[in-house]
C-alpha cells in the first residue's frame, strides 16, 4: 500500500465502535415541518444513560449500525440520519423515559405504510441494549400525508351512498362465527338486516373454510341483502371478508363482491398486511366499494404497556393505508382515563386536525389536510342497555357493532335487531330533545321497551 493511500485512509475513515449519542443525540435540533416525528417509551438496560439509549433508537431506526463504516463517507449523514432531539421522564416510572426522534422525509417511500414501519419499527425493537421499547405516537407531516390516498371514500361519502344521516350506524357480527353453512349464515344475515340493522359482518376469521367456502357465503349474503332492501326500503350491507392467503385471492373476492353489486367488503389489515390493505383500498376507491377494517392481532402489538406499539399509531397507519371503518373497541364500563385515551385515537380517525393533548395520549398535533376520515366501530360485549352511553360517547359518526347483543335475543335474530334499532332511535331522539343520556339513559330505554320486542 502506498503512503498516499495510507494517508487518505487514515484521514477519511477510522474503524471501531463509538457512542451513538456523539452523532444521533442532538438536543439543539429544531424539527422541520417535513420531518416524521416519533415518541418512543424506552426502558433501557441498567446503567445506560438516557441520551445514549435515545440516540441508539434514532440510529438503529435510520442510518446507524453498531460501528463506523467506510461508506458513511459516500453520503450525507446529516441529511439522512434520525435525530433524538428531546428526552423526558415518564411520570411514576423511574426507569423509563420518552425519547423523541425526528426522521427526514427522504428516508421513506411515498405512499407506503409498509416502508414507513419497516424503517421506524422494523429492527430496533430487538436491540439488546433495551429491555423494552414502545412506539407511543407518530406525527405524519402534511408532505407525506399527501402521498397517500387514504380511506376509499370516507365518512360523508359513505353516508351519501347509504342515504343515512343524523345517527350512528348499526351492525352485528354473525354468530357462531365458525361452523354455519353458507345458507344458514345467509338466513341470519337476512333476519338481522330485515329487523333494522344497517350492516351485518363476517367475523375476522371467516375466510374460506371447508364448512363454508367464500363464494357460497358471498352469494347467500348478497341474496339476503337484496331481499332485506326490498322489504325495508333501506340500503343494507354485509361486510364480506375478502382476506385471503394471497393478494391474488383477496382481489378475486373483492372483484366478485363488486360483480354482486354489494356495497361493502372487509379486510383484516394487520394479519393481511399493509401492502395488501392499500391494494384493496385503491380497488375499493376505483370501484365504489366501502371497506370495513378489522384489527385482528392488534393486542399482540399494542397490549403491553412497555413494549410494542400503541393502537393510536396503528389507527393513523390505517387512515393512511385506507379503510372506511375500523374497530376501535368500546369505553363502556372502562376507567375514565382509558376513555380519554380511546376517544383520543377516535378523534385521530375522524377529524381533519387534532391538537396535541397529552391527557388523551396525543403526543403531536396532527394535520390530515384532505385525507378522508374513518368511522370508528364500537364493539365487544355491548347490548341495548349500553345504547345511551354509546350514543353520548361516540356521537353520530360511528358504527355500533353488536353480536350477542342482537343474536342473543330470546325471541330470535330479527327481534334482536328491532330492539337495537328502537333503542338507538330512542336515544337519538332523546338527545335531540335535550335530555341527558348519562342521567336518564335507563329511563329512556325502559320507555322504548313499550315499542320493542
Curated annotation (Swiss-Prot):
Keywords: Acetylation, Calvin cycle, Carbon dioxide fixation, Chloroplast, Disulfide bond, Lyase, Magnesium, Metal-binding, Methylation, Monooxygenase, Oxidoreductase, Photorespiration, Photosynthesis, Plastid. Its cofactor is Mg(2+). The active site is at residues 175, 294. One of its GO terms (molecular function) is ribulose-bisphosphate carboxylase activity. The basic functional RuBisCO is composed of a large chain homodimer in a 'head-to-tail' conformation. In form I RuBisCO this homodimer is arranged in a barrel-like tetramer with the small subunits forming a tetrameric 'cap' on each end of the 'barrel'. RuBisCO catalyzes two reactions: the carboxylation of D-ribulose 1,5-bisphosphate, the primary event in carbon dioxide fixation, as well as the oxidative fragmentation of the pentose substrate in the photorespiration process. Both reactions occur simultaneously and in competition at the same active site. It is found in: Plastid, Chloroplast. One of its GO terms (cellular component) is chloroplast. Binds 1 Mg(2+) ion per subunit. GO terms for biological process: photorespiration; reductive pentose-phosphate cycle. It catalyses: 2 (2R)-3-phosphoglycerate + 2 H(+) = D-ribulose 1,5-bisphosphate + CO2 + H2O; D-ribulose 1,5-bisphosphate + O2 = 2-phosphoglycolate + (2R)-3-phosphoglycerate + 2 H(+). Substrate binds at residues 123, 173, 177, 295, 327, 379. This is Ribulose bisphosphate carboxylase large chain. Its EC number is 4.1.1.39. NCBIfam families: PRK04208.1 (NF003252). It comes from Sherardia arvensis (Blue field-madder).
Amino acid at each position: 500500500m502506498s503512503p498516499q493511500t495510507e494517508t487518505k485512509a487514515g484521514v477519511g475513515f477510522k474503524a471501531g465502535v463509538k457512542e451513538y449519542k456523539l452523532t444521533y443525540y442532538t438536543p439543539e435540533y429544531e424539527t422541520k415541518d417535513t420531518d416524521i416525528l416519533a415518541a418512543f417509551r424506552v426502558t433501557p438496560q441498567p446503567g445506560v444513560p438516557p441520551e445514549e439509549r435515545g440516540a441508539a433508537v434514532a440510529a438503529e431506526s435510520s442510518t446507524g449500525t453498531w460501528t463506523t463504516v467506510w461508506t458513511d463517507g459516500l453520503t450525507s449523514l446529516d441529511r439522512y440520519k434520525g435525530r433524538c432531539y428531546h428526552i423526558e421522564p415518564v411520570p411514576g416510572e423511574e426507569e423509563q423515559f420518552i425519547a423523541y426522534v425526528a426522521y427526514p422525509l427522504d428516508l421513506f417511500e411515498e405512499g407506503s405504510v409498509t416502508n414507513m414501519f419497516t424503517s421506524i419499527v422494523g429492527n430496533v425493537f430487538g436491540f439488546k441494549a433495551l429491555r423494552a421499547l414502545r412506539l407511543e405516537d407518530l406525527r405524519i407531516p402534511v408532505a407525506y400525508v399527501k402521498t397517500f390516498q387514504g380511506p376509499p371514500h370516507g365518512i360523508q361519502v359513505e353516508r351519501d351512498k347509504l342515504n343515512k344521516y343524523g345517527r350512528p350506524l348499526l351492525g352485528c357480527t354473525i354468530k357462531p362465527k365458525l361452523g354455519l353453512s353458507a345458507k344458514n349464515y345467509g338466513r341470519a344475515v337476512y333476519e338481522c338486516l330485515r329487523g333494522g340493522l344497517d350492516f351485518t359482518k363476517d367475523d375476522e376469521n371467516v375466510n374460506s373454510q371447508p364448512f363454508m367456502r367464500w363464494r357460497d357465503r358471498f352469494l347467500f349474503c348478497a341474496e339476503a341483502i337484496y331481499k332485506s332492501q326490498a322489504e325495508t326500503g333501506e340500503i343494507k350491507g354485509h361486510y364480506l371478508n375478502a382476506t385471503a392467503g394471497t393478494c391474488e385471492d383477496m382481489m378475486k373476492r373483492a372483484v366478485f363482491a363488486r360483480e354482486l353489486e354489494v356495497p361493502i367488503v372487509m379486510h383484516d389489515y394487520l394479519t393481511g398486511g399493509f401492502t395488501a390493505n392499500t391494494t384493496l383500498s385503491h380497488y375499493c376507491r376505483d370501484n365504489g366499494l366501502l371497506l370495513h377494517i378489522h384489527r385482528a392481532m392488534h393486542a399482540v402489538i399494542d397490549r403491553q404497556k412497555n413494549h410494542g406499539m400503541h393502537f393510536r399509531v396503528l389507527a393513523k397507519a390505517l387512515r393512511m393505508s385506507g379503510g372506511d371503518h375500523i374497530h376501535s373497541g368500546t369505553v363502556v364500563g372502562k376507567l375514565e382515563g382509558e376513555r380519554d385515551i380511546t376517544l383520543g385515537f377516535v378523534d385521530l380517525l375522524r377529524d381533519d386536525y387534532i391538537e396535541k393533548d397529552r391527557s388523551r395520549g396525543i403526543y403531536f398535533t396532527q394535520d390530515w389536510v384532505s385525507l378522508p376520515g374513518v368511522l370508528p366501530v364500537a364493539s365487544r360485549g355491548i347490548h341495548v342497555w349500553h345504547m345511551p352511553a354509546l350514543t353520548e360517547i361516540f356521537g353520530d359518526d360511528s358504527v355500533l357493532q353488536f353480536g350477542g347483543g342482537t343474536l342473543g335475543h330470546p325471541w330470535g335474530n330479527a327481534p334482536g335487531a328491532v330492539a337495537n334499532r328502537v333503542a338507538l332511535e330512542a336515544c337519538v331522539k332523546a338527545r335531540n330533545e335535550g335530555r341527558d343520556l348519562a342521567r336518564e339513559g335507563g329511563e329512556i330505554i325502559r320507555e322504548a321497551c313499550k315499542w320493542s320486542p
